[in-house]
Amino acid sequence: MAARRKARKRALEVLFEADQRGLAPLDVLKDKILRADPPVGEYAVTVVEGVVEHQARIDEVLSTYSMAWPLDRMPAVDRALLRIGTWEVLYAADVPDHVAVSEAVEIAQELSTDESPKFVNGLLARIAELKETLSA
């Protein structure tokens, strides 16, 4: 699982950088692949491409269930991490929901604010709970 964790972090770096610099995530991804320092793994590419492909729906789901936290008011790290976690829950059939949630929470503990892990856990757990209705 360590390889997947690294891939999630790498995908987070790409999405965060794109968000902060106002660039297209796929352009940032291509740049990172070309520089390959550190290398961008296959799963990181899959995650970024998946988030980009489904971003409108992912953002709609996050906006609906994040209650009083509009996406643009969330810390950028949390926003990127929640997009990754939501993509894994809704679209990555090979990732169990509990793994997607716990990985996102652990990365939030490492990289975000003190409040973020609880917020990420609650929101992604709710999305996982409603997965069947959200995927329809």
UniProtKB/Swiss-Prot annotation:
Disulfide bonding pattern of the chain: none
GO cellular component terms, A-Z: cytosol
Signal sequence residues: none
Keywords: RNA-binding, Transcription, Transcription antitermination, Transcription regulation
Entry superkingdom: Bacteria
Keyword Glycoprotein applies: no
One Gene Ontology MF term: RNA binding
InterPro entries, sorted: NusB-like_sf, NusB_fam, NusB_RsmB_TIM44
Coiled coil: none
Keyword Transcription regulation: yes
One record GO biological process: transcription antitermination
Role noted for this protein: Involved in transcription antitermination. Required for transcription of ribosomal RNA (rRNA) genes. Binds specifically to the boxA antiterminator sequence of the ribosomal RNA (rrn) operons.
Family note: Belongs to the NusB family.
Name by which UniProt lists this protein: Transcription antitermination protein NusB
Source organism (scientific name): Kineococcus radiotolerans (strain ATCC BAA-149 / DSM 14245 / SRS30216)
